[in-house]
Amino acid sequence: MLKVNDEIPRFEILTDKAPFKVSDHIGKKIVIFFFPKADTSGCTAESIAFTNLQKEFDQLNCIIIGISKDKPQKQAKFREKYNLTCELGADYENNVCEQFGVWVEKSMYGRKYMGIQRSTFLCDEEGIVKKVWEKVKVPGHADEVLEAIRELGN
C-alpha cells in the first residue's frame, strides 16, 4: 500500500463522465477514496458524505475521486440515484487498486476472497501522499479528511 511521502501513480481511469487523469489535477489537492462496491450501504454513505462536503473541498482547491471495480455504467446509475458530485472511477480491470495496494485478501464468515480494502489517500498539489486512512470506518470519515486538508494549509 502507498504510504505517506510516496508519489501517487499518474493513472488515468474511466469515470461515469469522462476519463480522469491525475496529471490534469496536479496543482490541486486530491482525495482518492477506494470503496468496495457502488450502491451498497457503506459505500453509499461514504460517497454521500463526501458529496455533502463538496463545497468545502472545492474551497480548499481539492478534487475528490471515489474508485471501485464497478463499470462506468454502474457508477453513472449510482451517481444519479444519490445525486453524487464527486468523480467516480471505474477500475474494473483492477489496475489502480493494485497500484495503490488496496486490492487485498479479505475474510468473511471464514471464507477468504480478494477485494478492495476501504482506504483513502490525501495527496498534495504535487501528487505526494500526505495522509493514508486504511480500513476506513465510514461515520465521520469525510469530515476527518476535510480537517486533514485544512491542516495541510494552502
Task: Describe each region flagged by the PLM.
Residues 1-154:
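Chalcogenol-based redox active-site neighborhoods
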